[in-house]
Amino acid sequence: MNLGIIGTNFISDRLIEACADLSQITIYSIYSRKMTTGTEFGAKYGVTRVFDDLEAFLSDPELDAVYIASPNYCHCSQTIAALNHGKHVLVEKPAASNKTELNQMIAAAEKNHVVLMEAMRSAYIPGYQWVREQLPKLGKIRSAQFQYCQYSSRYDKFKEGVVLNAFNPELSNAAVMDIGVYALYLFLMLFGKPETVQASAVILHNGMEGAGTALLGYKDMVGTVIWSKITEGIGPSVIQGENGSIAIDHISQFPAARMILRNGEMAEYVNNGPANNMCFEAEIFADLVAKKTVDRTFDSSYILKDTILCFDVMDEVRRQTGIVFPADK
């Protein structure tokens, strides 16, 4: 599969490095708004097909699929353009600015019979499956607290009056979209749709959400999801059942997790796999594309079902906390 890259930031570096050991994927071309930027980026990986014209990039008949790691507000338009050219798409999280955009993207994927997948790396790493397998041992789940709080490297500049892209809400940026999505996504994968959502947020002087919390209500349990780009979290995410608890270190990386039961039983997961955990999502995407070539009934709504649910909740969080993007208008 010949894969083209849209976006030349660090996350594109990580994806390309993750693909290095995957025989199914060849990094084929680069798109950047500036030719010099794209050429310099491609040179690091020996990629010489570089474009600063999106139409020309997508019109290449040898291009099979596209990885999109541009700013959030670009995801929808660039994804739909790629899908309409018959290219499979792996789009960075958050896949879109809102649920409306996501639905438009899914419709384009289904119309063009191509794969659309969100690059939510933590959903595909082995640690998540380990937690899912241990859950029955906890008995009835009564409480879960997931958190992802990471002091942004760009926040000091923001406090000095320099607003970089990461703190610009005009680009569909918010703490819930940028890092809260990791914790919310995994929480919803494990526990499903909540009956109630109660959200609060810290809004910075330019309208950017710096931190937030969602209380998620269920019939038999309560959930709390916390995120922040302006503070540093030090504790694990925790699932508490009547028979015991599971603690998960760093929800987006899953380096380790521990289960302790009231009867004294203990178990531990330690990630001994690749340091770059984006290899798992890349391999699954390649497998889905290969499957699509023989199975024309592939349903993008199914592979994106957790993304759809996450956007339902994130849209409600933003509605309650007054976070509005240009894409919402």
Predicted features along the sequence, with ranges:
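Contiguous beta-strand/loop segments that form the cofactor/metal-binding neighborhood of enzyme cores
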Residues: 183-255, 283-288, 292
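C-terminal helix-rich "cap/oligomerization" subdomain common to oxidoreductases
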Residues: 65-67, 284-329
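Predominantly a Rossmann-like dinucleotide-binding segment in NAD(P)-dependent oxidoreductases
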Residues: 122-195
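Rossmann-fold dehydrogenase core element
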Residues: 104-122, 142-143
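N-terminal Rossmann-like dinucleotide-binding module
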Residues: 1-45, 326
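Hydrophobic residues in well-ordered beta-strands that form the structural core
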Residues: 51, 91-92, 116-118, 248
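Beta-loop-alpha module in the N-terminal Rossmann-like domain of NAD(P)-dependent dehydrogenases
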Residues: 45-108
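Active-site loop of classical SDR/Rossmann-like NAD(P)-dependent oxidoreductases
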Residues: 271-283
